[in-house]
A protein has these predicted regions:
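C-terminal-of-GTPase-core extension/linker across diverse P-loop GTPases
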Residues: 1-4, 10, 137-328, 333-339
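Phosphate/Mg2+-binding loops and adjacent switch elements
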Residues: 73-190, 200
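Short, surface-exposed linear patches
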Residues: 32, 56-59, 82-86, 93, ...
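Flexible, active-site-adjacent loop/turn segments at secondary-structure boundaries
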Residues: 19-27, 41-47, 53-54, 66-67, ...
Length: 339
């Protein structure tokens, strides 16, 4: 929805004024794209152990897209332009306003539930348009396409009943058969409530949804780490909402980090969850995958307790893993490759 704090939150993420923030609808027209560091305290600890010259965190890309209004599926507001932009992202981060402020322009009353339903309905309507065209296409009517047609028909019924595709598609097989339809409601979704700084939900453990005060996060992003910590303490907030958001987005994308550390740098490397050791080595350098021999691995906690590779090895905490090893988040690794 327009004027709910998306661009304020986006700018806080990037710690600079990149997206236009204005008190009128559709201040954002073209998408703003920013690459954000993934908070990872483990890198600071590893850097101290290894006396690293630098720290290189993992990153995730955020896109600030124009607000959607009722009727977007048929062209209202920025309509099809918005929907084209959202089709290009992997996870939808939906921001809804849940605070009162008479100075901020907003159509209707403050009702996050209704705002969420408006957005979800428009995405469902657009997907219905896609599915209707698919049902009429020769591809799903062709011989041998019975499974694909069954999934499309299932989607048509589910979407008509108001269910998003992510709920309708229950199995991995269904999701794979529907992949080339590029459905908007098949994407994973994170719901963020933009609340006031006095809202008690900011001070409670976060559940499935996130409660963030974009105004506070904007202020925190302009402060030094020490001043930001003091301000959060004053507000009674234990953890930055942005840190929670970034980590949740990273996990929702199905990503994890393995870690490398040495005098030159301590670094988090981004891989897909479930990736095997040779493919992970290939993220560092393509030749490493081809010439992979084995991976020297230590659990992060054990590595820190041992204060480095030598003692970890002496204590028997270092493992040598082969080509079938599935990487885990927080693995501290050195890859052994052939010449």
């Amino acid at each position: 929805m327009p004027n709910v704090g998306k661009s304020t939150l986006f700018n806080a993420l990037l710690k600079r004024q990149q997206a236009l923030v204005a008190n009128y609808p559709f201040a954002t027209i073209e998408p703003n794209v920013g690459v954000v560091e993934v908070p990872d305290e483990r890198l600071n600890v590893l850097s101290e152990i290894s006396h690293s010259g630098r720290i290189v965190p993992a990153t995730v890309e955020f896109v600030d897209i124009a607000g959607l209004v009722a009727g977007a599926a048929t062209g209202a507001g920025l309509g099809n332009k918005f929907l084209t932009h959202i089709r290009e992202v992997d996870v939808i981060l939906q921001v809804v306003r849940d605070f009162a402020d008479s100075e901020i322009v907003k159509e209707g009353s403050v009702d996050p539930k209704t705002d969420y339903e408006v957005i979800e309905t428009e995405l469902i309507l657009k997907d219905l348009e896609t599915i209707t065209k698919s049902l009429e296409s020769k591809d799903v009517k062709a011989k041998g396409m019975e499974k694909k047609r069954a999934v499309v028909e299932k989607l048509f019924a589910g979407l008509n009943a108001g269910k998003p595709a992510r709920i309708v598609l229950e199995s991995d097989e269904d999701r794979e058969l529907a992949r080339d339809l590029f459905l908007l409601t098949a994407k994973k979704e994170i719901l963020v409530y933009n609340v006031s700084e006095t809202d008690q939900r900011l001070r409670e453990p976060m559940g499935e949804n996130l409660y963030i005060c974009a105004k506070v996060e904007s202020e925190l992003s302009s402060l030094s780490a020490e001043d930001a910590k003091a301000y959060m303490l004053e507000l009674g907030i234990k953890e930055s909402g942005l840190d929670l958001l970034i980590n949740k987005a990273y996990a929702s994308l199905g990503l994890i980090s393995f870690l490398t550390t040495g005098e030159m740098e301590s670094r988090a490397w981004t891989i897909n969850r479930g990736m095997k050791a040779p493919q992970a080595a290939g993220v560092i350098h393509t030749d490493f995958e081809k010439k992979f021999i084995k991976a020297k691995v230590c659990d992060y906690g054990k590595f820190v307790e041992a204060k480095g590779w030598k003692e970890a090895s002496d204590k028997g905490w270092v493992r040598f893993e082969g080509k079938e090893y599935e990487m885990k988040d927080g693995d501290v690794v050195e890859f052994m490759v052939g010449s």
